[in-house]
Swiss-Prot record:
Motif (DEAD box): 497-500
Sequence motif: Q motif, positions: 340-368
Name of this chain's protein: Probable ATP-dependent RNA helicase DDX46
Residues given in the record as ATP binding sites: 384-391
SUPFAM superfamilies: P-loop containing nucleoside triphosphate hydrolases
Gene Ontology BP term (one): positive regulation of erythrocyte differentiation
UniProt-recorded Gene Ontology molecular function terms: ATP binding; ATP hydrolysis activity; RNA binding; RNA helicase activity
E.C. no: 3.6.4.13
Biased composition (Basic and acidic residues): 25-39, 88-112, 126-168
Location in or out of the cell: Nucleus speckle; Nucleus, Cajal body
Keyword Hydrolase: yes
UniProt feature, compositional bias: Basic residues: 1-14, 40-87
Lineage start: Eukaryota, Metazoa, Chordata, Craniata, Vertebrata
Domain of life: Eukaryota
Length: 1018
């Protein structure tokens, strides 16, 4: 063991060497030499065994490394073997036997080394030759397979081209050919590249083989080659087609920002197409739904169980009880009996606790009758006075209705929808609803316009059982994100509050669009304080066998409101308002109603000057400001509010004590809602109404409201109404009642359509699009201006310069200017005497035909004859015939009519003498706007038009404001155009028309702060 170890460990060998030296120095030399020979033989055998092991290890390394690594490894091994042999030779004893053994070992090693090197080199060459043969064979197979595939691809392309002969897109065919040529060139380049660098191709194939081995698809060497060739066929086809397809996609330049910028600069955007697409996209959700194709979940409507106490009541007792509840009247079969306490309506304990917490002691008359009717699953029309608790009447049955159904899941719409006409009323109902929804774990979302839509969309996506909305914003929500925000598929309970306003002509399309998208077997409830008969017919279209509950008559002011009507002049209204505010301002909050937004802002300034802090509320204020103003008014931060009728509906302020109608309401329902803001929930209130003599037509509605509510009617109001009726009767006019809000909405009739077309034409003309192809048959702006001109054309004949026959011609035509021109004439020349005689004979013949004597000659003829005879003009006596002719001329001038006899006389006079025509035209500009009149009547404009057209233009007549007619002998302001050339008159008229048109366009598109909130179409 010790001898073997000294051949492998240096320390052991040194230790052995020192031991051998000590032995050599020993006296027993024979024994020492014998041992040394034995050791040398053992050493040589071990050296040979080690060389064989090294050869085996080198062979294993050759298989694992590349050719370059193998060469380096062999050189390193040779250097190591030499160093080891030298080291071991130094370790041997220095005697003669050891030297001989060393020489033998070296000779053996030198004989073995060439053999070992030759073996390694031959093995490497053999491996390289075999590998090269395999690569060449594989390349040949690949080349054949690729050529076959190219032929098949070409055939397919030819077949595709033949199949697309019908196409007219020659550019696409050229692109296909170019792409095919590029494809073949790319394949050739790849083949050339494979010849240049075969090692890369081989390594790729090795990777493919490894993948196939892992998948277990290759079972042998032959199978491996075949599978490899098949795989490459598929690879060739895919690698050639996929880049081609991606290249075609890349031509769209969708992800290239530079290309996108370029396209946006060069291409024109069709705004009309984009708008149409957007509107169509919005309408997709709101189109009528085919409910027969949708399978809705069943639900329960009837939850009402009549308690024994009510069941024992006889019909007579029920009638008496309804009479006690302010005279409830019920229409419809099967209406339940009215309840007496909250417990009898069948609501949960949580709702009862909420009612107790918010001091709802017992049901009001409308609640007592409406709640059991709705709980029974019936559709309802509820009519009750303002402040009677209509909101609770439809909220409590709604909670019971919702809790009976399964919870709202993800991406599902609400179960109940409450629609209101105003944003303020929507917020108020939401606030009232949240008093109960928190304890019932229900979610309420208020959807209204004027605010950001993103927050409301986020709330709807989280899910809600109840939506309180205005119709316009609800339609926007249904169309947002292709209908993914919310839907109406699970809606089973629909409430329309202030139903008469909702079914106004302006709200009806939006309301019907929403209702038609709800399932047909829904439960629909309507409430309002006023419900005209015309609106009732519209409402019944969406109701199914409704029950009508009416409390206290239709449209009646609450008896708790003390009403006063004051007939007053317009100038004294503000002072009277200050007097009323002095009495009531300290007692509570006050609302002052006006009719227009600008009047609200003006009255606000006047009150601020009078040291009354106040705020104004109208539709022109931003929604956030409106919300804050109402909150401040309800909280008592500001106790005086100036508002339009936007605040007249649904606004509930506890401490409101006074309502002042500064502008008289224009119909009965508006008065009821204004006065109904005070005197709510049994509190005392006061209502003052100012009416002027010019507003006598509204006095009948105020008189009716006072009589129906049981208030005293002032004698001045009765006298005002009586005088108005007598005046209308004397004029032969019929007095019509103006009930309802129908006059405020869009009518969607031909008049509004015509106004919209006119506004569209004005905009097109301003943008230079007046020659577009979509012009309709409506009057354009040029025809409107022409009709307002009320043009009058005349053609007058005058004698040529130097002619003496002007007197006769002027006498025939009746021209005054001819007389003024005759004053400068001298004795007629000899050449004109003959023509003068012909004119005299013609005049005598005409007089003889008409049986007229010398006394019948008109003033112009007498003056002409006197001048021709050389005498003086004597003031003529005015006969009855002359007066009649003057009256006839006035009528003819007003009607722009020329008698036939006069035309015949002018024609004969023109034939008898050489005359010069003068063309005249009158353009009436009295009815145009002031700026338009100024523009065409300025000195610079008239001078420029005269120089351009070579016509004389003068301003005549007097300006008369609208509604005032000129007196006899006067005319409205007009422009008189005179010229000897008809073309000059036409050019002057065209230039005047152009100037007026430009001014009208400017006025149409300019901002006019004085008419804020109202628009006037010229």
């Amino acid at each position: 063991m010790g001898r073997e170890s000294r051949h492998y460990r240096k320390r052991s060998s040194s230790r052995g060497r020192s031991g051998s030296l000590s032995k050599s120095r020993s006296p027993d030399s024979k024994r020492s030499k014998k041992d040394d020979r034995t050791a040398s033989r053992t050493h040589s055998r071990r050296e040979r065994s080690r060389s064989r092991e090294r050869r085996r290890s080198r062979e294993r390394k050759r298989q694992r490394r590349s050719s370059r690594d193998r060469r380096r490894s062999r050189s390193r091994e040779r250097r190591r073997s030499k160093s080891r042999s030298r080291g071991r030779s130094k370790e041997k004893p220095e005697n003669g036997d050891q030297t001989a053994d060393k020489k033998k070992i070296k000779e053996e090693k030198e004989e073995e080394k060439p053999e070992d090197q030759d073996f390694d080199q031959n093995t490497l060459e053999e491996e390289m030759r075999k590998r090269k043969e395999r690569v060449e064979k594989w390349r040949e197979e690949q080349r054949k397979t690729a050529m076959e595939n190219i032929g098949e691809i070409k055939k397919e392309l030819e077949e595709m081209k033949q199949g697309k002969k019908w196409s007219l897109e020659d550019d696409d065919e050229e692109q296909d050919k170019a792409a095919e040529a590029e494809e073949s060139e790319r394949m050739e380049e790849e083949e050339v590249g494979e010849e240049v660098d075969p090692l890369d191709a081989y390594m790729e194939e090795v990777k493919e083989e490894v993948k196939k081995f892992n998948m277990g698809t290759m079972k042998g060497a032959n199978d491996k080659k075949g599978g490899m060739s098949v795989t490459k066929v598929v690879t060739v086809v895919k690698t050639k087609k996929m880049p081609h397809a991606t290249k075609k996609k890349g031509e769209l330049m969708e992800n290239d920002q530079d290309a996108m910028e370029y396209s946006s600069e060069e291409e024109e955007v069709d705004l009309q197409t984009a708008l149409t697409g957007f509107q169509t996209k919005q309408r997709k959700v709101l189109e009528p739904v085919d409910h027969q194709k949708i399978q809705y979940e069943p639900f329960r409507k009837n939850f009402y169980v009549e308690v024994p106490e009510l069941a024992r009541m006889s019909p007579e007792e029920v009638s008496e009880y309804r009479l006690e509840l302010e005279g409830i009247s019920v229409k419809g079969k099967g209406c339940p009996k009215p309840i007496k306490t909250w417990v009898q309506c069948g609501i949960s304990m949580k709702v009862l606790n909420a009612l107790k917490k918010h001091n709802y002691e017992k049901p009001t008359p409308i609640q007592a009758q409406a709640i059991p009717a709705i709980m029974s699953g019936r559709d309802l029309i509820g009519i009750a006075k303002t402040g009677s608790g209509k909101t609770i009447a439809f909220l409590l049955p709604m909670f019971r209705h919702i809790l009976d159904q399964r919870p709202v899941g993800e991406a599902e719409g609400p179960l109940a929808v409450i629609m209101t006409p105003t944003r303020e009323l929507a917020l108020q109902i939401t606030k009232e609803c949240k008093k109960f929804s928190k304890s019932l774990a229900l979610r309420v979302v208020c959807v209204y316009g004027g605010t950001g839509i993103s927050e409301q969309i986020a709330e709807l996506k989280r899910g809600a059982e109840i939506i309180v909305c205005t119709p316009g914003r609800m339609i926007d929500m249904l169309g947002a994100n292709n209908g993914r925000v919310t839907n109406l598929r699970r809606v089973t309970y629909v409430v329309i509050d202030e139903a008469d306003r909702m079914f106004d002509m302006g709200f009806e399309p939006q309301v019907m669009r929403i209702v038609d998208n709800v399932r047909p077997d829904r439960q629909t409830v309507m409430f309002s304080a006023t419900f005209p008969r015309t609106m009732e017919a519209l409402a019944r279209r969406i109701l199914s066998k409704p029950v009508e509950v009416q409390v206290g008559g239709r449209s009646v002011v609450c008896s708790d409101v003390e009403q006063h009507v004051i007939v007053i002049e317009e100038e004294k209204k503000f002072l009277k308002l200050l007097e009323i505010l002095g009495h009531y301002q300290e007692k509570g909050s006050v609302i002052i109603f006006v009719d227009k937004q600008e009047h609200a802002d003006g009255l606000l300034k006047d009150l601020m000057k009078a040291s009354y802090p106040c705020m104004s509320l109208h539709g022109g204020i931003d929604q956030y400001d409106r919300d804050s103003i109402i909150n401040d008014f309800k909280n008592g931060a500001c106790r005086l509010l100036v508002a339009t009728s936007v605040a007249a509906r649904g606004l509930d302020v506890k401490q409101l004590i006074l309502v002042v109608n500064y502008s008289c309401p224009n119909h009965y329902e508006d008065y009821v809602h204004r006065a109904g803001r005070t005197g709510r929930a049994g509190n005392k209130g006061y209502a003052y109404t100012f009416i002027t003599e010019g507003q006598a037509r509204y006095s009948g509605d105020i008189l009716k409201a006072l009589e129906l509510s049981g208030s005293s009617v002032p004698a001045e109001l009765e006298q005002l109404w009586t005088n108005f009726k007598e005046q209308q009767k004397a004029e032969g006019k019929i007095i019509k009642s103006s009930s309802g809000f129908s006059g405020k909405g869009f009518k969607f009739d031909e008049t509004e359509h015509a106004l919209a077309n006119e506004r569209k034409k004005l905009q097109k003309w301003a943008l230079g699009l007046h020659d577009s192809d979509d012009e309709d048959t409506a009057l354009d702006i040029d025809e409107q201006i022409e009709s307002m001109f009320n043009s009058k054309k005349r053609v007058k004949d005058f004698s040529a310069p130097g002619s003496v026959s002007a007197g006769s011609a002027g006498g025939v035509s009746g021209s005054v200017s001819a007389v003024s021109g005759l004053g400068s004439l001298s004795t007629p020349s000899a050449g004109n005497i003959q023509k003068l005689e012909i004119a005299k004979k013609l005049a005598l013949r005409i007089q003889a035909q008409k049986n007229l004597g010398a006394e019948a000659q008109d003033v112009m003829q007498q003056a002409t004859n006197a001048i021709l005879r050389g005498g003086t003009i004597i003031a003529p006596s005015v006969s009855a015939k002359t007066i009649a002719e003057q009256q006839a001329e006035k009528i003819n001038a007003k009607l722009n009519y020329t008698p036939v006899e006069k035309l015949e006389e002018e024609r004969q006079a023109a034939e008898a003498a050489e005359t010069v025509k003068r063309y005249e035209e009158e353009l009436e500009i009295n009815d145009f706007p002031q700026t338009a009149r100024w523009k065409v009547t300025s000195k610079e404009a008239l001078q420029r038009i005269g120089e351009y057209s070579e016509a004389a233009i003068t301003i005549r007549g007097t300006y008369f404001p609208p509604g005032k007619e000129p007196k006899e002998g006067e005319r409205k302001i007009y422009l008189a155009i005179e010229s000897a050339n008809e073309l000059a008159v036409q050019k002057a008229k065209a230039e005047i028309t152009r100037l007026i048109k430009e001014e009208l366009i400017r006025l149409q598109n300019s901002y006019q702060p004085t008419s804020k909130g109202r628009y006037k179409v010229l």
